[in-house]
Structure formats: C-alpha cells, structure tokens
Amino acid sequence: MSWIILVIAGLLEVVWAVGLKYTHGFSRLTPSVITVTAMIVSLALLAWAMKSLPVGTAYAVWTGIGAVGAAITGIVLLGESANPMRLASLALIVLGIIGLKLSTH
C-alpha cells in the first residue's frame, strides 16, 4: 500500500511542478490554489509512505516520478524538446526508480 501512496504522491508532484508555470508567480488565483493543494497533499502522502519505506528510497522515487512526469508533460503538452539525450536521461531515471523498487523489501 505504501508504494501505491508513493506513486500517487509522485503524480501530484507532477501536478504542482507543472502548475507552478501557470500560477505566474502565484498571481493567478485558481492555478495557485490547485498548485498549493497538490503540494500539500503530495507532501502529506510522501510522509505517510515514508512511515514504512526507507527514506532515501521513498524520496528518490518521489522526485524521480516528479521529474520524469514533469519532463514528459513539458514535451507532450508544452512543446519542449524531446532530443535523444533528454529521452535517454529520462529512461535512466525510470530505470533507477525500478531498481530502487526491486531492491526494497
């Protein structure tokens, strides 16, 4: 169950990371409320997952999901570049996340 909670926390990290772009420095109310809410819930779920997962593993997986998710969102929705080096780097992060999951008992 902790892994599911951690994945949800990571997905919410994507929401708030991308949401920051739309807040315009927290000057727009609706995107700001959504972003801050996603931040709070994401951190709360991360803390909950860390009760039974190793801190280093949980934090690395959380940030990895957020980084990969934000980068993919940027590529797909925001027209950011998807050059081979960037895609290979994202693949390495995903492999690291898988490795951390497989090495945690």
Curated annotation (Swiss-Prot):
Residues 50-57, 103-105 are periplasmic. The gene is gdx. GO terms for biological process: monoatomic ion transport. Guanidinium ion exporter. Couples guanidinium export to the proton motive force, exchanging one guanidinium ion for two protons. One of its GO terms (molecular function) is transmembrane transporter activity. Residues 22-28, 79-81 are cytoplasmic. It is found in: Cell inner membrane. This is Guanidinium exporter. The chain crosses the membrane at residues 1-21, 29-49, 58-78, 82-102. InterPro entries: Small_drug/metabolite_transptr, Small_multidrug_res. Keywords: Cell inner membrane, Cell membrane, Ion transport, Membrane, Transmembrane, Transmembrane helix, Transport. SUPFAM superfamilies: Multidrug resistance efflux transporter EmrE (SSF103481). It is a multi-pass membrane protein. NCBIfam families: PRK11431.1. GO terms for cellular component: plasma membrane. Belongs to the drug/metabolite transporter (DMT) superfamily. Small multidrug resistance (SMR) (TC 2.A.7.1) family. Gdx/SugE subfamily.
